[in-house]
Amino acid sequence: MVRSGGTTLVDGVALRLAPASRTALVGASGAGKSLTCAALAGTLPAGLEVSGSLTVDPDGVGSGNGSCADSDQGGRNEGTNLLGLPAARRPRGCRIALVSQDHSTALHPLIPVGRQISLASQASGRTLVEADQRATDYLYAVGLDESLADRVPGRLSGGQRQRVSLALALAAEPALMIADEPTTALDVVARAEILRLLTSLTSLPEAPALLLITHDLPAAAICENVVVLHGGAVIERGPAAQVLAHPEHPVTVAMCEAAAEETIDGALAAAGAAA
């Protein structure tokens, strides 16, 4: 639950995310997606109150009212509730990595991207040699050539910077990767590439669970499960194929109809441009 003073902004969002699974949290603007994302990532603005639980164990990530154990390389922290703890205070082995839609906050403008990924890997407990090798591996995993490692973010395209953000998140070796509107401001080709990449990342060894935050229902189709938010509450959930093809709640129905119209309009516009 997220509250501001006496007002409840988000309530009853219970999730159970298995390793390497893909879940989409969808909703229109103001539905509560960003607040839920911030609560999970430990980046809620000051002044907001949060209650509930967020736990990590070998079987995945859980949020809601339950509890489970989380572990790191140095021991066990039985039943640690991460919700309400800022990201910097969360114990190792319980990392939740956030891929923000805003590259300017995710990437340092003056440090070469390969160095940034290496530093993130070192912060996860890797030696310098290991971290440098992993930086190369992570660049490769997100479809970037290691020759780009020496470039600062400003010398990369928007799609390349988003890929670097994904590599940076992987370097944290998280149990959960939250991708917050990762295709915002990308062109159609870059958008499709990022969605394909997100799908492929969950097939990596020791892949994290993926939580995709989006208002874009076609993007949600890459996920196995969909959770629909409206007014800070869950109104519908289930397998993506079922929810997107046969929505039950009126709000979800309206969202699917609007998405279908946008898809048709986009196809017509593309056809007109090609003519």
Language-model features, listed with the residues they occupy:
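Conserved ABC ATPase signature
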Residues: V152-L156, Q160
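C-terminal boundary and immediately downstream tail of ABC-type ATPase nucleotide-binding domains
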Residues: V99, L244-A275
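ABC ATPase NBD coupling module
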Residues: V61-A97, R115, A123, V243-P247
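Conserved ABC ATPase "signature" region
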Residues: E130-S147
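Conserved catalytic segment of ABC-fold P-loop ATPases
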Residues: A221-V228
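Conserved catalytic motifs of ABC-family nucleotide-binding domains
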Residues: E173
